[in-house]
A protein has these predicted regions:
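Residue-level detection of beta-strand scaffold positions
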Residues: 49-51, 119, 128
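Active-site acidic Asp-centered loop
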Residues: 134-137
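Conserved donor-nucleotide/metal-binding helix-loop-beta segment in metal-dependent transferases, i.e.
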Residues: 139-166
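N-proximal low-complexity "stem/linker" segments adjacent to membrane-targeting elements
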Residues: 1-66, 95-103
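Active-site-proximal specificity loops/subdomain of glycosyltransferases
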Residues: 57-126
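Short aromatic/hydrophobic "clamp" motif used to bind/position activated sugar donors
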Residues: 131
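Short alpha-helical segments and helix-capping/turn motifs at coil-helix boundaries
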Residues: 26-36, 114-120, 155-165
């Protein structure tokens, strides 16, 4: 990736998920980022934010946290956000007078939007420069038809975003 600035940027990748295949998806994205040259750029620090819901599909915490060592070694920081972390964030908002009980529950309660909110909250608290949300049901490939043949092609989603915002 080409940038005029050579300063280090902290990039947050946020996944709001409840799907068992999350780790397979994460592996696909990391292979994609390595292929694009993003991994290995000393000026880009990848920070992973995973807000998971164990009740959505009856999953276990390990379905999200068992990241292979080869991938973990490439991540600057990893934040796993489950019900305990959400309760703590709600408590903080109430304790500091930022939100009452009702609004803390609305902001960080249940559902996809609340998961994205808690990821954003964590990203702000951890000085993330850029945050990109990726869906847990979309792989970094696209299928196109060429003369009656389906072609699978990789897309460099994160690289393209950074080229245009960093």
């Amino acid at each position: 990736m080409k940038r005029e600035k050579k300063e280090t940027i902290n990039v947050g990748i946020g996944f709001a998920t409840g799907r068992k295949q999350f780790l397979h998806l994460l592996k696909s994205y990391f292979l994609n980022w390595q292929e694009s040259g993003l991994i290995g750029d000393e000026n880009i620090k990848i920070n992973l934010f995973v807000a998971y819901d164990l009740k959505y599909r009856g999953t276990k915490k390990a379905d999200y946290t068992a990241i292979p060592g080869a991938i973990s070694a490439l991540i600057e920081n990893t934040f796993f956000i489950g019900s305990r972390e959400i309760a703590q964030a709600q408590y903080e908002l109430k304790q500091y007078g930022i939100a009452d009980e009702e609004n803390a529950e609305l902001l960080f309660g249940k559902g996809y939007a609340a998961q994205r909110n808690i990821i954003l909250y964590y990203a702000i608290k951890n000085n993330i420069d850029y945050l990109l949300f990726l869906d847990d049901d979309e792989y970094p490939v696209v299928v196109t038809k060429n003369k009656n043949v389906a072609l699978w092609s990789g897309q460099h989603v994160l690289t393209k975003h950074l080229e245009n915002i960093a």
